[in-house]
């Protein structure tokens, strides 16, 4: 089936194939970092399901790499992923003197590169959080230029138009 069984202390956890990063291969003895996605009880005992594709996983990786997140100076407000390809995280600083993007990137990219390496080369964009949904979406899609944005209140969605030549960077 392609699932991996991971020893976590005295118990075993399952990392399903669909929760692994695409094209990621694991071998016996590999050290694995993963997010505990679900813990449940079955007739055979307790089951622990791990994930390496969850947006929560990237949040936890940044907490490990960026002490300012763990200390509460910087907060990850949102995260979205296309596992193995790209991810975006939205960050906010609770201290005006601290640049949330620069802090998450680190000196010469050291912090973000450590997370990228753990995620098998997944490209990570870090954007500034904005409480205004329209402004947040415009910022999240940079460097693409947003031509128009329409908020659809009833479905809590937005229609965003960018030029076709900007589509790849959006």
Show which residues each predicted segment covers.
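RNA-contacting regions in translation and RNA-metabolism proteins
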Residues: 1-170
């Amino acid at each position: 089936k392609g699932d991996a069984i991971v020893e976590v202390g005295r118990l075993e956890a399952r990392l399903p194939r669909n929760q692994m990063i695409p094209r990621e291969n694991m071998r016996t003895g590999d050290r694995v970092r993963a997010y505990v996605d679900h813990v449940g009880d079955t007739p055979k005992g307790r089951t622990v399901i791990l994930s390496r594709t969850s947006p929560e996983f990237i949040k936890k990786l940044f907490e490990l790499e960026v002490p300012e997140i763990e200390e509460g100076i910087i907060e990850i407000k949102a995260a979205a992923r296309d596992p193995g390809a790209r991810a975006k995280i939205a960050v906010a600083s609770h201290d005006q003197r601290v640049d949330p993007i620069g802090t998450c990137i680190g000196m010469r990219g050291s912090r973000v590169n450590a997370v990228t390496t753990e995620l098998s080369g997944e490209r990570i964009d870090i954007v500034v959080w904005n409480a205004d949904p329209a402004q947040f979406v415009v910022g999240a899609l940079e460097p693409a230029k947003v031509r128009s944005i329409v908020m659809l209140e009833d479905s809590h969605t937005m229609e965003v138009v960018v030029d076709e030549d900007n589509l790849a960077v959006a």
